[in-house]
UniProtKB/Swiss-Prot annotation:
Record GO terms (molecular function): ATP binding; ATP hydrolysis activity; ATP-dependent FeS chaperone activity; iron-sulfur cluster binding; metal ion binding
Keyword annotations: ATP-binding, Hydrolase, Iron, Iron-sulfur, Metal-binding, Nucleotide-binding
Role, per record: Binds and transfers iron-sulfur (Fe-S) clusters to target apoproteins. Can hydrolyze ATP.
GO annotation, biological process: iron-sulfur cluster assembly
Protein name from the UniProt record: Iron-sulfur cluster carrier protein
GO CC annotation: cytosol
Record SUPFAM superfamilies: P-loop containing nucleoside triphosphate hydrolases
Record note on quaternary structure: Homodimer.
Binding site for ATP: G48, K49, G50, G51, V52, G53, K54, S55
Naturally occurring in which organism (per UniProt): Methanococcus maripaludis (strain DSM 14266 / JCM 13030 / NBRC 101832 / S2 / LL)
Family according to the record: Belongs to the Mrp/NBP35 ATP-binding proteins family.
Length: 289
């Protein structure tokens, strides 16, 4: 629809274009509904700001569920920062496609993934897209990707609460809820509060808040040191009447694993232990709904 649209279709020379676009959107919505109907739980992972470990939480939530025997898919909705392929060690693989749609790239463990990162010529190529084009790509991943039957689809959304995030959340029929990721410091917690408000405005259930980087595990003594402060996520959860899912500490072992494309939950470390507790709490929460 043109930016100067008066709302009077009878006097508009572009009304046929609008009509065609509307039909295409309706067809795409129908395809999204059909695709998503084969997936039991749809969970979005959000953050109010970048750099808090949202993608790390998404990847390890997926890996833990996969280790528990669930069929899991991950949609990398962070169009301008598509890191999921590298974090799962499948960044050298390209998706296949035929008349039935685009097929997700599967990890050796069987986690299905889709990301704009698979379609870039190299890792240094930026995505210089405005909001509508980026939103359209996410809708296409929901409609055209042949996800098949899954127990869980996790959507790694872009940071913030703008048009791309809204389009993503509203495009998913019967979304089961959002997990909001923050770090302990006040600036991050402030942005997490905005994510809570955005989810409430869109009437999407909030599964809970995860406090990532909740302390640093000393590699010498294994003691957790609160270098970013302590308890900011839990405090915000109480004030906002949102469930607190747990704290994930920074762990050098986890960082090394992530750089190699290996989820931290496969490692023997404190971060892995705490993350598995978070996942069990998420399962309890969604199965109560």
């Amino acid at each position: 629809m043109a930016e100067e649209c008066s709302g009077n279709c009878d006097s508009c020379g572009s009304s046929s274009d609008c009509s065609d676009t509307k039909k295409m959107m309706e067809q795409q919505n129908a395809q999204i509904r059909d695709n998503m109907s084969k997936i039991k739980y749809k969970i979005a992972v959000m953050s109010g700001k970048g750099g808090v470990g949202k993608s790390t939480v998404t990847v390890n939530l997926a890996a833990t569920l996969n280790m528990m025997g669930y069929k899991v898919g991950v949609l990398d909705g962070d169009i301008h920062g598509p890191n999921i392929p590298q974090m799962l060690g499948v960044d050298q693989i390209q998706p296949m496609a035929d008349e039935n749609g685009i097929y997700p790239v599967s990890t050796p463990q069987g986690i299905k993934t889709m990301s704009i990162g698979y379609f870039l010529p190299d890792k240094n190529t930026p995505i210089i897209w405005r909001g509508p084009k980026a939103s359209g790509a996410i809708r296409q991943f929901l409609s055209d990707v042949n996800w098949g039957e899954l127990d869980f689809l996790l959507i790694d959304t872009p940071p913030g609460s703008g048009d791309i995030q809204i389009t993503t959340l509203q495009a998913i029929p019967d979304i089961d809820g959002v997990v909001i990721v923050t770090t302990p410091e006040e600036v991050s917690v402030l942005d997490a509060r905005k994510s809570v408000s955005a989810a409430n405005t869109l009437e999407i259930p909030i599964i809970g808040i995860v406090e990532n980087m909740g302390g640093f595990v000393c590699p010498e003594c294994d003691k957790v040191i609160d270098i970013f402060g302590k308890g900011g996520g839990e405090k915000a959860a109480k004030e906002l009447n949102v469930f607190f899912l747990g704290r994930i500490p920074l762990d050098i072992k986890a960082r090394v694993a992530s750089d190699r494309g290996v989820p931290m939950v496969t490692m023997d470390c404190k971060a892995s232990e705490e993350f598995k507790k978070v996942v069990n709490t998420v399962l309890e929460r969604i199965k109560k709904e």
